[in-house]
Amino acid sequence: MGALFMVKSKAIMIGAGLSNMAAAVYLIQDGHWDGKDITFYGVDMHGANDGGATTDFTNEYWNKNHPMANTTGYVARGGRMLNYRTYVDLMDLLDRIPSVTEPGMTAAEDTRDFDAKHRTYDIARLMQGGKGIINAGKLGFNNKDRTLLTKLIMMPDSEETKLDNVSIAEYFKDDPHMFQTNFWYMWETTFAFRTQSSAQELRRYMHQMIYEFTQIEHLVGVNRTRYNQFESMILPLIKYLQGQGVTFIDNKIVKDWQFKDTPMQDEITVTGLVIEDAQTGETEEVEVDEDTAVIFTNGSITDSATMGDYNTPAPENMDYGVSASLWKKATERFYNLGTPDKFFNDRNASEWVSFTLTTKNHLFLNEIVRITTQEPGNALNSFLSTTPITPLNQKDVNMSIVVHHQPHFTTQQPNETVLWGYFLYPRRQGEFVNKPYIKMTGKEMAQELIGQLSKVDPGPGNIKDKEKENLDSIVNNIPVYMPYASALFNNRAKSDRPEVLPKHSTNLAFTGEFAEQPYQMIFTEQSAVRSGEIAAYHFAGVPMDNLVKTPRYDKDPKTLLKATKKMFD
């Protein structure tokens, strides 16, 4: 980190997601700042960790489907599986703020309490027609698979640039068998990796999640919040920060920068921001004085997302994305701030479609429980094709679902069920609905799910025989198209993301999933929180030695031995 050390006393946060909220908490608690000196500008007040009644989202900036014909039910664009073992910065953050649903508990205690009473143990991780529940504990490696994966695990941090611009497909180009293993089916759907994704990022995951590699088939290392992540994590942060006097200004898009003119082209000082009102289109200029830090979340995986409903597919939104556009403008001025096009100009590598399904009774839920033989809250069920569907003429996962512990929302009624699912490759053709997933309505996605369940139904009877009753029980199913959902995994070089504290920056820091941090893997609340923590400590003058210590299981002999044994199961 080569940023110029300049302690500030005020901050402007561009983006109101987890990483910037974390930065604000650390500025207040460890930097001893006054909350009134922190101002957030964002298009919404939740970032990617959202979740709520459909009506809460219909008028948000990113929803282009107006008017929605059906606004009943709930929606969450995505979901998060936590891991206490590695998400140490997240748990430190949540221990600093009170829960909004459990009096007397911190948000971390709330999650630990719920998780201790509802431990994850998935017994139907992979399912396939003709086989039902697959014994996924057998990872299916051959010796070439083991050799190449071991090379990733043993590659030191200092050599990871050898994987600059190397995709997973390229890394395993002489070993197509890897993509036919139970390991790959589970890894791609647990973390949303694709064959086009970065081998460099896969290496980081193998290092930081090496302990979970040894028990991936049951997801026993997965920890979950009591409710959706908005109500269990983001809302407590908002309430705490508002109580500290922090200002949140939403429906605002930061459109452009004003930088100080300096003789050196890599000296970065923000002097002003051009901000547009997302509803009126009016713009204003906000001055940034010398005592103000600018902390910017440079890219969001939910940028340009769109919603459909039960009878309407989610439309494609071709926007580059508001946060990525602002990042791109910064890179046009300074050469050491990364390459946003690597992440936001290749939808073929980054897009997927999710859905949130709400029912008025538990008929559908009970059918899923019967077929998968496990209670809600344990599952990430992935349905493996019975015929080749990939460019390599191989089988792959058609779709995946998460059956939450109920209720998943605090306002959810006792008779209601909410479940979530996604299609990692949205342009593949449906098996039971003859169109690409991206073109499907919420009803058609439900029909596709019933079809996939019917292939693995052990009987007696079959869910397909009750298709009408199950469909009639659905009050809504909200498809969400996310063009950049896996953008953070896109093939890249290490230099394609700016450092949290860029060299020669006097007041600008980057946070979130598109900021480069040593060792940290992305698409995790861990990396998001840590980036905010680093930015906060820098601008508050807190020594970096005070950062939460990151465990290195990849350097623990016992864990490595356990992983080696797992490879030969």
From Swiss-Prot:
Cofactor note: FADH2 seems to be the active cofactor and is produced through the reduction of FAD by NADH.
Catalytic activity line of the entry: (9Z,12Z)-octadecadienoate + H2O = (10S)-hydroxy-(12Z)-octadecenoate; (10E,12Z)-octadecadienoate + H2O = (10S)-hydroxy-(12Z)-octadecenoate; (9Z)-octadecenoate + H2O = 10-hydroxyoctadecanoate; (10E)-octadecenoate + H2O = 10-hydroxyoctadecanoate
GO terms for cellular component: cytoplasm; plasma membrane
Pathway membership, UniProt: Lipid metabolism; fatty acid metabolism
Thermal effects: Optimum temperature is 42 degrees Celsius for the hydration of linoleic acid and 37 degrees Celsius for the dehydration of 10-hydroxy-cis-12-octadecenoic acid (HYA).
Keywords: Cell membrane, Cytoplasm, Detoxification, FAD, Fatty acid metabolism, Flavoprotein, Lipid metabolism, Lyase, Membrane
Protein name: Linoleate hydratase
Species per Swiss-Prot/TrEMBL record: Lactiplantibacillus plantarum
